[in-house]
């Protein structure tokens, strides 16, 4: 595991925000995939304020999501809705740079539409940067243990939460693995045990998608806070 440990979650998101500035200064579109969850909320809040809101050249950044729940953007469960509320409402970014999963649509229709958008905008399927979280069950995006097909050649998949049955759309493992860079942003003491297990056990012996999904031709790194890393 390629880990970087920060004193707090805020330190970790500040590092990511600084990297957004650098990516935005490249003279070409940069495709970044965002994650849901509590730590990314901290990231979006940080990006919406000085100095980052002013320093980032937003027109060069294109935003996507690793997954989203099939709910309208106004629903508190919507990953896109969280970013809109905490970040997009506070900055100037071209509407065409935001590539959301339309959770208000019928899932099969939206799966097809989203895959078509992915193919049209990123024909080679290679994201510049995919930021992922990890649940205490080892899931990432909406790819859950014991139900993820790691060989699925599609770009996206309809997934069902194993407990709630809630329907989501997620990027597939294969699409994620094509990225130039994957960063798992994992914070909090509740993740310490599973991180220890991932660090000490070969991925093929674990059911956790977060342990298995790595950039095939790029960099995979784990940004942790001290609480999450306490057993490493």
Walk through the language-model features, giving the residues of each.
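Glycine-rich beta-strand-to-loop/alpha-helix junction loops that act as flexible
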Residues: 34-39, 132-136, 187
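Ligand-binding beta-strand-loop-alpha-helix segment within the catalytic cores
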Residues: 56-131
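N-terminal glycine-/serine-/threonine-rich phosphate-binding loop
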Residues: 1-32
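Glycine-rich N-terminal segment of FAD-binding domains in flavoprotein oxidoreductases
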Residues: 26-51
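A short secondary-structure junction signal
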Residues: 111-112, 141-146, 194-198
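A glycine- and small-aliphatic-rich helix-loop capping segment at beta-alpha/alpha-beta transitions
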Residues: 46-56, 81, 145-153, 201
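Class I SAM-dependent methyltransferase SAM-binding "motif I" and its flanking Rossmann-like core
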Residues: 130-174
């Amino acid at each position: 595991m390629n880990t970087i440990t920060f004193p707090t979650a805020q330190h970790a998101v500040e590092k990511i925000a600084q990297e957004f500035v650098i990516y935005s200064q490249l003279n070409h579109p940069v495709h970044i995939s965002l994650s849901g969850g509590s730590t990314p909320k901290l990231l979006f809040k940080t990006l919406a304020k000085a100095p980052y809101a002013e320093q980032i050249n937003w027109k060069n950044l294109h935003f996507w999501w690793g997954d989203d729940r099939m709910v309208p953007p106004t629903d508190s469960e919507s990953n896109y809705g969280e970013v809109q509320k905490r970040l997009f409402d506070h900055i100037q970014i071209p509407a065409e740079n935001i590539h959301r999963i339309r959770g208000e649509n019928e899932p099969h229709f939206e799966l097809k539409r989203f895959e078509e958008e992915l193919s049209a905008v990123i024909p080679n399927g290679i994201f510049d940067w995919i930021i992922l979280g990890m649940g205490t069950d080892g899931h990432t995006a909406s790819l859950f243990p014991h139900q993820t097909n790691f060989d699925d050649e599609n770009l996206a998949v309809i997934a069902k939460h194993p407990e709630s049955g809630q329907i989501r759309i997620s990027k597939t493992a294969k699409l994620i693995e094509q990225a130039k860079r994957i960063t798992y942003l994992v914070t909090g003491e509740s993740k310490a045990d599973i991180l220890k297990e991932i660090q000490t056990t070969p991925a093929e012996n674990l059911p956790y998608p977060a342990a298995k999904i790595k950039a095939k031709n790029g960099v995979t790194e784990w940004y942790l806070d001290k609480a999450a890393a306490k057993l490493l």
